[in-house]
Amino acid sequence: MKLKIYSYKGVKSTNDTAIRLIKQNIKQGIVTSDIQTNGKGQRGKKWVSRRGNLFISIFFPIGKSLNLKKITFSNLKIIKNILKNIVPYKINIKLPNDLKIMNKKVCGILQEIIYYNEIKFLIIGIGINIKSSPTIKEYELSLIHI
């Protein structure tokens, strides 16, 4: 599957931008942005999105029922394995959708399923604190400051 990359200087949310692209009949792709002004987290929480961090959403059609919990866990394991090569500290998976280092959140995943024109799409949103972190006690960690 070859995915086109849609890069933006700023969006409200990469997941919302993916939904907008799907509604323009774009079937698959990757959305990236330098910043998000209204990033989304689990259960309606806001993902604080500062410049220098990674904000990405991957979207594509899916044909059958999928277990989102298993997909989220698999994605967390993949990202954890990538970060293990960069970060000298233990990386922990905090279910349902976070990675933590030194008990501080550095990565979150938000997956959504939408239906458009009778097609089922999966959107995988990933946020990683690389350069900066929010000034929220639980999240005060970025990879560059480890």
Give names to the regions the model predicted:
Residues 1-86, 107:
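N-terminal lobe of the biotin/lipoate ligase/transferase fold
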Residues 26-28, 117-120:
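Short coil/turn connectors at secondary-structure junctions
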Residues 82-117, 127:
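Acidic (Asp/Glu) carboxylate-rich active-site/surface patches
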Residues 122-131:
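Conserved beta-strand-loop-short alpha-helix elements that form
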Residues 132-140:
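Cytochrome P450 core scaffold surrounding the K-helix E-X-X-R motif
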Residues 144-146:
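Conserved small/polar residues in nucleotide/adenosyl-binding loops
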